[in-house]
């Protein structure tokens, strides 16, 4: 598969995920910059992203979305898996070794946070994910390093 096609597919999938997040109406009700106590483990924005940082960020969001009971996020979680596969292809084309992403210790406390503020967790996670994806889209145009 030509790497240009992989890069185009990656960008298209990112745009699709952003659209899916927009379609979940309640995600518009919280600013991604809003501080919600206990949700510091949800990644914020990283202006300069390498392929490995993108993969790591997506892995964290996958773990968070997998722990949410909302059916809204199932397709988005599947899309993130596919997006990570595309990033792995891009990384392989540049001979970048992507480290295995391990479960985050900070997510072990996720259950407690979810019980306290399920709705807020979903809204903040999706809002920040959307911002991160838009950052990744911009970064892919700059041909990110490993």
Curated annotation (Swiss-Prot):
Protein family according to the UniProt entry: Belongs to the leptin family.
Superkingdom classification of source: Eukaryota
Gene Ontology process terms (BP): activation of protein kinase C activity; adult feeding behavior; bone growth; cellular response to leptin stimulus; energy reserve metabolic process; intestinal absorption; leptin-mediated signaling pathway; lipid metabolic process
Disulphide connectivity of cysteines: 96-146
One function term, GO molecular function aspect: peptide hormone receptor binding
Source lineage: Eukaryota, Metazoa, Chordata, Craniata, Vertebrata
Localization per Swiss-Prot or TrEMBL: Secreted
Protein name: Leptin
Listed InterPro entries: 4_helix_cytokine-like_core, Leptin
Record keywords, A-Z: Disulfide bond, Obesity, Secreted
GO cellular component: extracellular space
Function noted in UniProt: Key player in the regulation of energy balance and body weight control. Once released into the circulation, has central and peripheral effects by binding LEPR, found in many tissues, which results in the activation of several major signaling pathways. In the hypothalamus, acts as an appetite-regulating factor that induces a decrease in food intake and an increase in energy consumption by inducing anorexinogenic factors and suppressing orexigenic neuropeptides, also regulates bone mass and secretion of hypothalamo-pituitary-adrenal hormones.
